[in-house]
Amino acid sequence: IVICQVNSIVEEGQLPRVDIPGDWVDYIVKASEPYPMEPLFTRDPAKIQDAHILMGMMTIRGIYAKHGVRSLNHGIGYNGAAIELLLPTYGEELGMKGKICTNWVLNPHPTLIPAIESGWVEKVCAFGGELGMDRYTAARPDIFFTGPDGSLRSNRAAAQVAGLYGMDLFLGGTLQMDYVGNSSTVTNGRLSGFGGAPNMGNASGGRRHTTRAWCEMAPQNGSMASGRKLVVQMMKSSSKFGPGFVPELEAVKIGRKAGMAAAPVMIYGEDVTHVVTEQGIAYLYQAQTPAERTKLLACVAQGTPLGEQVSPADIRDLRKAGCIAYPEDLEIDRSRANKELLAAKTLEEIAEISGGLYEVPERFRKK
């Protein structure tokens, strides 16, 4: 059953374009007032923290450059925004332009504009539009899949398929992770939705075309499978709500209490290949068992109960083996992890970089 809420009903032939054919629609509800469009995918660079920048630097060098990741999707958090704004600066320093992050399955993030304008991005397969980005996407049909009128179609089905089978990597933030890598944004008192993350953040078994990054994730247990998608979860090891790593996700109890047949887990641990905290990167794809995954996670969760499960000697050996990496292992200077390294520090700066085409949504405008 397809129900459409619309702002207006017009005569036949007056639509500028057709996104949904009329014979697919069962019911039309005309709204009493226009539906408010929200800038769902916009993150203000001014709110990016130094920890996000450090984690972004580690991700670029220790994951994207290490595996040659070219096609990817970012979630809508500040972690992804930081990485997008680091590409024209830190990524440029590493000589990675044209080698990583060239093809995106992504809503039109304003924070990607500096990378687009500096020649990093070849194509963006967008799910849909974003408030304030219409003029910019219309002006860049070389990057975005726009129609003859310059507008983005509702492209969700194609973008989901590209995300499931076409791209090399999904990266997203989470609020809580258990000791084997299951994660969720549903916690006590915080029922954050996780949108398309379960679709993007899983190893789709039907893929057969190969890339370097995909092949490097091949199981090490003699499986015939030749590769899998990189699934990266980013999270601070602790916050004001307590440790990010917990023995059991609060989502399990919440799901049980709500009568759900399946717990609202965002991404299953068996699909997670990398976990990044402010302490370092755990290369979970190298783990052979759940116990090994726990050990790697403990190395990037020092100062929490989970972190007590490994000794300094364990950490030293795992660093040497390349199963975990701290900033120093990646030759990253922690003191550089601040806003000075971002390609733009405000949305107003992004608007300037866009040549005035990006319009900062009212919610973010300085009063």
Language-model features: locations:
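Conserved phosphate- and dinucleotide-binding cores of soluble alpha/beta proteins
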Residues: 1-74, 78-102, 110-367
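Active-site histidine-anchored catalytic micro-motif
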Residues: 106
